[in-house]
Amino acid sequence: MHRSWILGMAFAGVAAASGCGGDYILTVPDQVAPAGGETVTVVRLQRNDFFVLAPAVEEAAMRFRIGDGPLRAAYTDNLGYAAAAVSVPEKPGRHTMTVAHLDMQGDEAERDCDVYVWDPSRPVVAVDMDCLPGLWLGSSEDAAKALRHLVVGANLLYLTRQSVRHHRAAHETLTKAGYPVGPILTWQREHWHIVRDGPYKLPRVVVEGRLVSQLPEVRKVFPHLATGVCDSALAAKAFAEAGLSVVMVGKAAADVSTELRRRESWSDLAAQGP
């Protein structure tokens, strides 16, 4: 069975009514998984008790479900993290996962996240979202056209250095600017691994504070992730270190160990392709 790894940490906002202990903050990331496989979903539950402070909620029961699929559950650890392996549908497409918690006082935190189910034999293109025009300044017309051409026969994922709390709004901005749909991942995420302990050797996810690149793990699940599109030397270096060929838009200097193809502009990329 294939397994996908946590992809990004999209801030999900306050997800419950106010109670005596404050509001819940439930963080649920975008998910990407191979069709018919499973996604190991890592979420975090906090409580907004002291204005900007948000202490972790420990030993909270979390429920995970995609549509009418099997229900999975896990308890949060001392950092507020909980993880569960959730089976995804056989049919590729964008599905919805619901993550929820109900406490003893009747306060509930619930969030939906997008689950992108992909055919692992299909090509995947990665794009540095931070270089796209139209999200902050400039016109998105040429860049959006170029990316729409890229996703003909391929899947697309976005990578960003932005704070995770902006990912949900970024999805809306991308859509309004005419860019194709795809999961938003942070360039790096917390490192985590699975251990088996206790008398029954049940699997448990341990989340560590150190950050690691997402791309190598994504490539293990989707081996046809082969191309990265960007306009900066830093992003080009990250793509090359993960073994991707680089398509550089513009004239920024770049020294990479993999194939480098240059396009003078987004309109040039739209006309020539990658």
Regions found by a protein language model. Give the residues of each.
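Short, acidic loop-to-helix structural element flanking the phosphoryl-transfer center
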Residues: L135-L157, V164-H171, G209
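Second-shell loop/turn segments in exported
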Residues: L132-L137, Y158-R161, Y200-R204
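Asp-based phosphoryl-transfer active-site loop
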Residues: P123-G138, F239
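Bacterial N-terminal signal peptides that target proteins for export
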Residues: M1-L7
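Beta-strand-enriched, solvent-exposed domains that form extended recognition/catalytic surfaces
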Residues: C20-P120
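C-terminal cap/substrate-recognition subdomain and adjoining C-terminal extension
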Residues: H166-P274
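Bacterial N-terminal signal peptides
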Residues: G8-A16
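Structural beta-sheet core signal
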Residues: V127, Y158-T160, G228, M248
